[in-house]
Amino acid sequence: MMSNNMPRHFLDLTELPTSELRNMLSAAVAMKAKRKANADGEKPLAGKTLAMIFDKPSTRTRVSFDVGMRQLGGESIMLTGAEMQLGRGETIADTARVLSRFVDIIMIRILNHEALLELAANATVPVINGLTRKSHPCQVMADVMTFEEHRGPIKGRTIAWTGDDNNVLASFAHAAQRFEFKLNIATPPQLSPSKALRDWIKASGAAITIGTDPEEAVRGADCVVTDTWVSMGDKDGEHRHNLLKPYQVNAKLMSLAHKDAIFMHCLPAHRGEEVTDEVIDGPQSVVFDEAENRLHAQKGILAWCLGAVA
């Protein structure tokens, strides 16, 4: 546990006990309910300022954090990698020290996970991982919230991941341990989880299986999750598409899941590639609730980081 004078960072799900993650989600659920009832008059982060650092632009992350901070009574400013020359001019450590004198909390979206860790190590205010190449904990907190909103407690349930190995999958693996659900992973052999993630899974004791058969992974699952096959800037798109075609989430694959299974995707989706229109627009899809819950889950995270949530 962190000491009272240490900032409350949100860097990875593995860094925090389940009780703290649950406190954030409980706060998120309560704040969403109050917002829907027009009863969210409390502004627990009034007078607080969030600095949002983006290595590259992101519509969803920027809007959800900006709106979330405003709804909690605070304000935000956006800084881009181009503006800051992060790590190329002033060092990351010095940037962290300076920003800590100006703002109350920092959210950073940067591919280099080590840069996130260096920023957090030198900041005297909380730092939130908005996304790195290694993990995407804010997204998966929203996903857990969405599952429980639709299907009740996630503990003991089965989540199936089909497609590529990426940062969202890593955070799902971390969540499987923290929230005690089963995770079935199916990827092409050439795109299987990294050795580092495999080693972590083995040591974690989490109920996670890794395979190559999407039908086996999805069979009987309570939730099916996928993500885009080719991230922005990837140069081997055609090769990856050929490998991943058998992992498309379509009606046939969804029919193998539990009859009440839901479908999730963090968006943006490439329709006709990793998922068909029939599935993403169908009755089992909760992708837009999931997208909305980024806002609410991140409000819970912001409030926890700044001590407004126990």
From Swiss-Prot:
Q: Which reaction does it catalyse?
A: carbamoyl phosphate + L-ornithine = L-citrulline + phosphate + H(+)
Its chief place of residence is: cytoplasm
Gene name of the record:
argF
State where L-ornithine binds. N167, D227, S231, M232
**Organism, per UniProt?**
Rhodopseudomonas palustris (strain ATCC BAA-98 / CGA009)
Pathway field of the UniProt record reads: Amino-acid biosynthesis; L-arginine biosynthesis; L-arginine from L-ornithine and carbamoyl phosphate: step 1/3
Q: What is this protein called?
A: Ornithine carbamoyltransferase
In terms of domain of life, where is this protein from? Bacteria
S-S pairs: none
Location(s) in or outside the cell: Cytoplasm
Does Methyltransferase show up as a keyword for this record?
no
Q: What is its EC number?
A: 2.1.3.3
**Family membership noted in the UniProt record:** Belongs to the aspartate/ornithine carbamoyltransferase superfamily. OTCase family.
Q: Where does carbamoyl phosphate bind?
A: S58, T59, R60, T61, Q85, R109, H136, P137, C138, Q139, C266, L267, R294
Which PANTHER family does this one have?
Answer: ORNITHINE CARBAMOYLTRANSFERASE, MITOCHONDRIAL, ORNITHINE TRANSCARBAMYLASE, MITOCHONDRIAL
Q: A Pfam family for this UniProt protein?
A: OTCace_N
The Gene Ontology terms for molecular function here are: amino acid binding; ornithine carbamoyltransferase activity
State the organism's lineage: Bacteria, Pseudomonadati, Pseudomonadota, Alphaproteobacteria, Hyphomicrobiales
Q: State the protein's purpose.
A: Reversibly catalyzes the transfer of the carbamoyl group from carbamoyl phosphate (CP) to the N(epsilon) atom of ornithine (ORN) to produce L-citrulline.
The GO cellular component terms are:
cytoplasm
